[in-house]
Amino acid sequence: MAMEARIRGWAAAGLLLAAFPPFAKAQESKRVDPVVVTATRIETPAAEVGVAVSVVTEEDFRTYHYATVDEALRSVPGLEIRRSGSLGKTTSITIRGATANQVQVLVDGVRVKSPTTGQAELSDISPDLIERIEILRGPQSALYGADAIGGVVNIITRRGTGPFSATVQQEVGNYDTLRSRVSGGGQWKILDYAFAASHLESNGQFKNDGSEARALSGRLGVALPWDSHLAFVARWNRTDTDLPVKFVCCGPLAVEPLIDVNQQQQSETLVLSLEGKTRPVPWWESRGRISRFENSMGFQDPVDPGYAFDFPAFSQINVERREAEWINAFHLGKWSTSTVGLEYRHEEGENKGVFRSRTHTQSLFFEEQLRFFGRLFLTGGFRVEDHSVFGTETTERGSLAYLIKGWGTRLRGGAGSGFRAPTLNDLFYPGFSNPALKPETSFSWEVGADQKLWQERIRLGLTYFHNDFDNLIRFVMLPVPPFVAVMNLARARTSGIEAMAEADLLKNLVGSVNYTYTDSETSGRNRPLAREPHHRWNVGLTWEPLARLSLFTQVHTASRQFEDETVGYNRGHTRVDVGGTYRALDRYGWLQAVELTARIQNLLDEGYAEVRGFPALGTQALVGVRARF
């Protein structure tokens, strides 16, 4: 019966793909390669970098009506998104088998990972004011230091341009979902400005399964002489989340969760950044930034009625990170760029009534880019990072890209080392911490090729990657108090393939597919890494049958994943999303356009859990209206 249901599901998905095609908007056949900044810390055409890089644009958010950042990242090859249940629940990201602790997440270059847990909470990042998201896969510690073993996700906010413009959007859906958003921006003389406010709430599928997220964002810039610019960015959000899954001691969570009726969490985040950049002469550009990240998280779980042996739990965790960086790039003609950077980082965390600790880090990095004949591009560099607790780490990375322009071919490859710093919890939390911990380390390499065919209407890519992880930090049981501790005692390996294809099938029809195969193994246990599927597929089509109408379909498939020795595997799943935009009104007075929007996630009502014990939502529809001024 399960097989028949899956066959019926795939058949229905096939019909939907034929009827409602998905993925990026149809464009002219001639495309311009994007310019990225995350791969080299300065603006560089993507074709000139040897690392695997993907870009999610502001246009993607408008086309697919992503309500959250994690939904926008699901279609990127090599990435795995794991949400623990419904909207607002904890959401993490892994890249090529590297855990969430080993992936660096930035907003305008500012680290937004918690110093205590070591993870970035994607549900706390609003999709407001996003111009693009650049995703680097592979080790990036030579540029970004600790916690960039698996890659970097850099969310870049939009700068105001041109006359004032604004967008107002309202959406409603099942599960009592309501989403409201307003944004605007523009430019006046030497000033540029952009702002946004949003609200997202939903009641979820269980009792005590609701969430409410509110966010404010703003960016103010000023143009200065000598090709200079100064910008101040502020982002605030608060997420109130009900947690319906009851913790069960000493065993894995059941597939069907036990409901906790009064467990709740609140998270409030503030990110502030002041950045200045200048290029007074063609051969030198300089950029400086100071920033501050704050997060306050409260957790409450009173005694549940009806349980004889239940116990209450409460916590209040406050963290702060202050950063300063200064980067200088020196250009020698068109063939050489040397980049030198200095960074300082101060981190502190407090679990009220438990512990309070702080660390500081100083870093120096150097990178050299060489360009030969407009075809061969070499990049190499290193970083020295000194941590106040565990000492100094040095990481290196090198890459190359070679263009065969007459064939539309790009060959690329690279290798590098990385490390993940122990968190404040690892080092200082009473009862299990270990101040003698060393960083997790890695060495990774990759080779790949990209091909354009049919006057660039077809775009293909293939990458092979290999990662070796050492000194992994793990919990171990002890025969004496405190009975549990963290130690450097594990090793792991991942390798695999990322393949992608995108085609402009017609002028109004674009299709894409990408596939990731990941083979992983934990040394000594002869088992794959937990929650890392062997196979992932993303399929999409976007169709514009009328000038006013755009339709899309996206299909996400993941194979089963190893959970642990007790329960074995968490089964795989296939999720189908569809939607579209209809422009109901064109220019009328101040109105630029009025659009009707729709997005339906999990159309086939697939029952699955990205994290075992935390069931994902069934079919979720969100429809609304968007007005642009």
Spans of model-derived segments:
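Gram-negative outer-membrane beta-barrel transporters
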Residues: 339, 372-378, 466-468, 488-564, ...
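Conserved C-terminal beta-signal and adjacent last beta-strands/turns
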Residues: 183-185, 221-225, 530-629
